């Protein structure tokens, strides 16, 4: 088992610091013959594949599902839902996304709770082009940045080359304050959901009329990073494990309303919360159909510091599963719960989710709660 210093990973793998890389990214970012991007380390002559990132609207994804159904290739299936609960600190790896990604089975997809620019910026003022943003993801233990840093080379291209085009200046390839991925950028929803640097920041100037409809929902976009190599796993102290072997996974990037930030008009708080949760989970299941995913790992989007009600998240998971899983290739849907004993205050998240799934029509035979007390064997 080999380990990577979390403070120096960018330079160790790319050959230069992030700030140096940004000044000459055209020398380090290459397109491979399969169309995917890769990072070229000029010091070691190593090429690190980064997979392929794209943004798709829910409407476009639904069209793909309709095509699948029409050609008879969709199949009925009842995937097993596994809710994972750790009962001790030692069992952390069972619910830590970096570890889970590094042990992923083939055809796995991981949902990432991100922001509306597919970047785990901690604030509206964080400068992605400042020369440290990607590097610092490896130092953040929250699960969104942990998921991204685990597939660190893909993270580099998603932040610094989502607009890759060899025919334009390489300084225009990356995300910065003036140009970003916009999951809520469609004209029909933009005025209802004002975004600054990926963060929803309501000002009170939004339209007083907002009624959730299918057209608006289908305008929401999600980010899909296909064939992302998982270079790193669990963290210990200042180090992170180097994956061996190195799984190839898909990641889907979604976001939720932050109920601890400036809020929408009070009459819209619940409807906009539910609208974005529905988009997050339906979008994820649709991406899984697109990619013929067999093993899907979900997270409680908006359930941490964003303060979304656990009941709303559980309901959105249930409805998305019931609506779309029958069209998928899914064998398992795993939902790790990060907090010890799955508790958030006085609420047992696992039990709320289990009961919501059952009430939503999912048979108890298809739902399992896995309780973990000890670390995985390969972490002992």
Predicted features, each with a name:
Residues 1-296, 300-380:
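Macrodomain-like recognition of ADP-ribose-binding/processing modules
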């Amino acid at each position: 088992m080999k380990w990577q210093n979390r403070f120096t990973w960018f330079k160790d793998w790319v050959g230069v610091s992030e700030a140096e890389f940004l000044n000459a990214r055209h020398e380090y970012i290459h397109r491979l013959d399969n169309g995917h991007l890769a990072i070229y380390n000029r010091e070691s002559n190593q090429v690190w594949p980064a997979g392929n990132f794209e943004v798709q609207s829910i409407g476009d994804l639904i069209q793909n599902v309709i095509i699948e159904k029409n050609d008879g290739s969709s199949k009925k299936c009842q995937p097993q839902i596994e809710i994972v609960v750790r009962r001790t600190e030692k069992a952390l790896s069972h619910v830590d996304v970096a570890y889970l990604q590094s042990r992923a089975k083939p055809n796995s997809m991981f949902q990432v709770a991100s922001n509306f620019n597919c970047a785990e910026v901690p604030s509206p003022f964080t400068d992605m082009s400042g020369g440290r943003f990607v590097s610092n993801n490896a130092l953040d233990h929250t699960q969104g940045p942990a998921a991204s840093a685990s597939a660190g080379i893909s993270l580099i291209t998603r932040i610094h080359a989502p607009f890759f085009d060899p025919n334009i200046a390489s300084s225009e390839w990356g995300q910065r304050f003036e140009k970003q991925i916009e999951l809520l950028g469609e004209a029909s929803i933009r005025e209802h959901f004002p975004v600054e640097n990926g963060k929803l920041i309501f000002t009170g100037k939004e339209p007083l009329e907002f009624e959730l409809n299918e057209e608006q929902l289908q305008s929401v976009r999600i980010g899909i990073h296909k064939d992302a190599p998982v270079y790193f796993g669990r963290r210990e102290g200042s180090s992170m494990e180097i994956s061996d072997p190195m799984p190839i996974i898909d990641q889907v990037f979604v976001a939720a309303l932050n109920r601890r930030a400036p809020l929408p008009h009070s009459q819209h708080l619940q409807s906009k919360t539910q609208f974005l949760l529905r988009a997050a989970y339906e979008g994820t299941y649709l991406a899984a159909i697109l990619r013929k995913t067999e093993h899907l790992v979900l997270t409680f989007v908006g359930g941490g510091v964003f303060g979304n009600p656990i009941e709303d998240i559980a309901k959105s998971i249930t409805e998305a599963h019931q609506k779309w899983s029958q069209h998928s290739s899914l064998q398992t849907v795993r939902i790790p719960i990060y907090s010890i004993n799955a508790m958030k205050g006085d609420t047992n998240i696992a039990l709320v989710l289990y009961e919501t799934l059952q009430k939503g029509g999912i048979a108890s035979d298809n739902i399992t709660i896995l309780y973990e007390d000890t670390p995985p064997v390969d972490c002992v």
